Structures are given as C-alpha cells and as structure tokens.
Amino acid sequence: MTNIRKSHPLMKIVNNAFIDLPAPSNISSWWNFGSLLGICLILQILTGLFLAMHYTSDTMTAFSSVTHICRDVNYGWIIRYMHANGASMFFICLFMHVGRGLYYGSYTFLETWNIGVILLFTVMATAFMGYVLPWGQMSFWGATVITNLLSAIPYIGTNLVEWIWGGFSVDKATLTRFFAFHFILPFIIAALAMVHLLFLHETGSNNPTGITSDMDKIPFHPYYTIKDILGILLLILILMALVLFTPDLLGDPDNYTPANPLNTPPHIKPEWYFLFAYAILRSIPNKLGGVLALVLSILILIFMPLLHTSKQRSMMFRPLSQCLFWILVADLLTLTWIGGQPVEHPYIIIGQLASIMYFLLILVMMPVASMVENNLLKW
C-alpha cells in the first residue's frame, strides 16, 4: 500500500512541496528567508485578524480604537506590537531574500523572479495602507504625501488622486477603503506566494555556486525542515525581543498624536523600510522625475536578468561583482539613513549622490564588472 502522503490529492501537494522535495545539498542559511517570509505572512494575517475584531475604520474612532486595543483588550498590546514589529521583520526578511537572489543570480528563474517583484510591490502597498490605519499624525500626513505623488502623472493625475481619496482630501472614505484593501491584500499575497513556489518547484532551487545540482539532491525533510525551524526560532526570538523590550523603537512618536489636518508635523517620513525609496524620491527636485525614480528604484529588479552579462550565474567566484554588490548594500543603508533626515545641507547632496550611485551601480558598474570578469577567465 502506498503511503497516504503520496496518494491523497491534498497531501500529495504538501509532500511534493515540503517533504519529498529534492533540494540541493549545499544551500546556505540565505535560503532560509523564503520559509521565514511564509511564517511572517501567517503571523501578520493572524495578528491582523484579531486587531480587526476591535478596530473601527472611522476617522472619529480609529485612533481611540487602537488605544482601546492596547489598554482594554486582553493581550491587545502584544497583538498590536507583534503586528507592527512583525511588519519590520517581514521587510528585513524580504530585503535579505531579494539580496540573496541578486547575489546568487536566482533572477534567472524568470517567472519566479517576476512574481517575486510583484509580491514585493504588493507587500509594500499593504504595509503603506496598514500604516495609515491608526490615524495618527504620521498616518494622516504619510497618506496625504504619498497618494499626492500620483498627481504628478500628466493629464489624469489629479482625477486619479481624488478617486483614490474618495473626496478632495484624505478623509473618512480614504480610511475605510484603506482598511478594506489592507485586509484583502495579505490573502492575495498568500495566493501569489503559492504561485511563486509553484514556479520555483518547476525548476528546483538555485544554490550558492550557481551550478546545476541535479546530480546532488537531498530530501527537503528532515534536512531543511530542521534548518527552517532553527531560522523560525531565531525570527521569533528577535521579534519578541523587539515587542517586549522596545516596541516603539522602529515607530514614529508623531503617530501617538491623533491625526490633525490643520497641523503638519515638522518632518514627514514613512516607516524605516521605505526610507531608501523616499530618499531617492526627495533627491530629485522635479515632482514627476522623483515619482519615476521612486518607482524605478524597485521596478529595476524586473530588469536584472537583462543586465546579467556574466558567464557565471552566481557571484560566488566573482570578486569584482561581490565588491560592487556590498557597495550597493552600503549605498542602500546610506539612502535609508538620509530618508529619515531633514531636507537640509549636507543631507540633500548626500542623498543625491547616493541616488545616482544606486542607479549607476545596477545599470552600469555591475554589468561592466561582469564583462571584465568574463575576460579575466581567459587569462
């Protein structure tokens, strides 16, 4: 008799994805982030569901309902902070996951990579709308500033912004629809993640060498299940340390002030995980140019397979490309820092230089370095 996990229609899918899946024997801890992202998503959906049970998406009561969750609901404070800091952990894992893909050339799996980029955009949209829901000062002004960027689109811009707002300013209609979208999007993300996995399992995983591993596979369970469990425990450890010791470390104090359309905060800035893109946006004096640079800073990932000029897939044996990759990481950290600083000297010029450097590294320097390395192979 065949094992039920191999014969049952549903169990068979789980078996082929998480148990008997042939996996390369040499994938490092950088391959842990996929499962960690899955755990983050489940955690966000669960904590979000419990928050939604007590939250009211009305401008008059939204801020009070969040206060009520923290003060009066049993363990409401821990649910709220797990959700807020869970988003930060989600983005840390996302950035690591994308960085791994860039370093080891995983973007050559075109369908998997493109769905991954769509997932990144969807998660960013979800996080942005979630930040608006507590209806604090930074929620309100963040929503106003970011949605207003769409007005830079020629001809239809203004109409588009008013259509998204549901009126002539960010108000009750905006908050209600943002709550609706924020609730539905994680389920769309879950569906996309399944398609992401489906395409990945068509080709099998990449590995650090970038060389085919068809002749050297091991079963996913128990080798990588136990490895994933270690990653999950570390993730929960870091998340709970944040939640229980410094829950407001990554938040903005302005968001503890109820939204007031008549009073603009001195420094409007998004959550830390959007600061790099925000810095690129601010570094261009022209509104439309800034918006285009903002979108391109993430959309550029779609073009990575086209920009791959090396004869080798991975950067494992390419010291020049490695060097440029880590300069890119440093550049992104610089942009993140600049995004949180006021618009004044010397931050403006640093932001502009870092933005130019970002696009130069990806579009020019890395492809050129790859071609140089190709020629060095002949020596």
Curated annotation (Swiss-Prot):
Its cofactor is heme b. One of its GO terms (cellular component) is mitochondrial inner membrane. Signal peptide: none annotated. One of its GO terms (molecular function) is metal ion binding. Keywords: Electron transport, Heme, Iron, Membrane, Metal-binding, Mitochondrion, Mitochondrion inner membrane, Respiratory chain, Transmembrane, Transmembrane helix, Transport, Ubiquinone. It comes from the Eukaryota. Gene3D superfamilies: Cytochrome Bc1 Complex, Chain C. The chain crosses the membrane at residues 33-53, 77-98, 113-133, 178-198, 226-246, 288-308, 320-340, 347-367. Heme b b566 binds at residues 97, 196. It holds the Pfam family Cytochrome_B. The keyword Mitochondrion applies. Heme b b562 binds at residues 83, 182. It is found in: Mitochondrion inner membrane. A ubiquinone binds at residue 201. It is a multi-pass membrane protein. GO terms for biological process: mitochondrial electron transport, ubiquinol to cytochrome c. Binds 2 heme b groups non-covalently. Belongs to the cytochrome b family. Component of the ubiquinol-cytochrome c reductase complex (complex III or cytochrome b-c1 complex) that is part of the mitochondrial respiratory chain. The b-c1 complex mediates electron transfer from ubiquinol to cytochrome c. Contributes to the generation of a proton gradient across the mitochondrial membrane that is then used for ATP synthesis. The cytochrome bc1 complex contains 11 subunits: 3 respiratory subunits (MT-CYB, CYC1 and UQCRFS1), 2 core proteins (UQCRC1 and UQCRC2) and 6 low-molecular weight proteins (UQCRH/QCR6, UQCRB/QCR7, UQCRQ/QCR8, UQCR10/QCR9, UQCR11/QCR10 and a cleavage product of UQCRFS1). This cytochrome bc1 complex then forms a dimer. Heme 1 (or BL or b562) is low-potential and absorbs at about 562 nm, and heme 2 (or BH or b566) is high-potential and absorbs at about 566 nm. This is Cytochrome b. The lineage of its organism: Eukaryota, Metazoa, Chordata, Craniata, Vertebrata.
